[in-house]
Design a protein with these regions (language model features):
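Hydrophobic packing positions characteristic
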Residues: 123-134, 139-327
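Glycine-centered loop/turn motifs
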Residues: 1-3, 96, 251, 273-274
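Intrinsic-disorder/coil detector with helix-boundary
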Residues: 101, 313-349
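Short, ordered loop/turn segments at secondary-structure junctions
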Residues: 117-119, 231, 330
Length: 349
């Protein structure tokens, strides 16, 4: 298990970027005439010396990845030699200490890091037995305990959308997995959608460069599914969390497109934001169904408006320009009170 380097890859969702760190040299102090563990991986004269890439250990920062890469490199590098020895009893020889073994040949003389030590006293003989196993113990439990390494398809992966133009028209997308490789993209991945069925469902494909969570059918990385998009430190939710949540309850439920078209369900009043439903386009056209004030307002970005007010029992129609009523049939105007018509000039035909 000797490698020339150990690379740890992870995903920093606070910055929406890859975390990677590589350790090229172990810091374990066991050294012999053969050098260190990372050197032995180069003795086979391979065109590319073996290296380890770790993608199944979640890390949250570059510093954490650096420490993990170095720790794994130290662990592997310390195992390039196994040794057992016995000597006259000495309580100073214990795990974590270094012993210097001499006169056992150029290849084996050197400094050894003690993994285990046992002191025995038998028949008036005081003896210290040591084992060198790197940073792992050499007991039976450790030997028989297999290390679990999940294959990429056996867990969820972060994906970055690279293509959403499905040639079959099935609404699939392709992604790259930054923690695995920055060069390759996935097979076409089916997108999990609300109410998806024949010519129905919530059609909202992720866009290129969106971060998504990807699962795999039967653990096969060649059969990916997009489970949903996720927010991160660069791609924030459409509304500030202080406006969305009040006292542990979700006050706003918002659907917002890339260009700014918004559909918002307001569950509780807060300031000028009243309970109801609000629709607004990027250009500023608005429809507001206000349950708290018991009215409906329709307003254009240019200032034309209609307000139907149940509380005031009134309807107001305003225009910043001309207004016309056109009917193919009759127009009836009836009021139980007065009808007032006012203008600079009134023409009746």
């Amino acid at each position: 298990e000797q490698v020339s380097s150990v690379e740890v890859r992870g995903w920093d969702y606070t910055q929406k970027k890859l975390i990677t760190s590589t350790a090229n040299s172990e810091k374990v102090v066991t050294t012999t005439g053969n050098g260190q563990g990372s050197n032995s991986s180069n003795k086979f004269n391979l065109s590319q010396p073996p290296k380890m890439t770790v993608v199944d250990k979640p890390v949250f920062s570059a510093k954490q990845a650096e420490k993990m890469a170095q720790a794994l490199c130290d662990e592997l590098g310390g195992e390039f030699v196994y040794a057992d020895a016995a000597c006259e009893g000495n309580p100073k020889i214990r795990p974590g200490k270094i012993v210097n073994l001499k006169k056992i040949g150029d290849r084996f003389s050197g400094k050894y890091y003690i993994t285990e030590a046992r002191l025995t006293f038998n028949q008036r003989i005081y003896k210290t037995e040591i084992s060198v196993r790197g940073l792992r113990t050499g007991n039976l439990f450790t030997t028989l305990t297999s290390q679990v390494h999940l294959q990429p398809g056996q867990t969820f992966l972060v994906g970055i959308v690279t293509n959403n133009k499905d040639p079959e028209g099935w609404g699939r997308v392709k992604v790259k997995f930054p923690t695995l490789t920055e060069e390759h993209e996935s097979n076409w991945a089916r997108v999990v959608a609300l109410g998806a069925a024949k010519q129905r469902g919530f059609d909202c494909l992720p866009e290129v460069n969106d971060e998504v969570l990807v699962g795999f059918e039967h653990g096969d990385i060649h059969r990916p599914y997009i489970l949903g998009g996720v927010w991160n430190g660069k791609d924030n939710p459409p509304e500030a969390i202080d406006d969305t949540v009040t006292g542990g309850k979700v006050r706003l439920r918002t659907i917002k497109t890339r260009t700014g078209h918004t559909l918002q369900f307001i569950e509780e009043d807060k300031g000028s934001s009243k309970k109801g439903i609000r629709i607004e386009t990027t250009a500023g056209h608005k429809i507001y169904l206000n349950d708290s004030d018991k009215n409906i307002e329709i307003e254009t970005s240019g200032g034309h408006s209609i307000k139907m007010d149940d509380r005031g029992r009134s309807i107001a129609v305003k225009s910043t320009g001309n207004m016309s009523l056109d009917a193919k049939g009759n127009i009836d105007i009836t009021a139980t009170g007065k009808i007032k018509i006012q203008g600079a000039m009134i023409n009746l035909n």
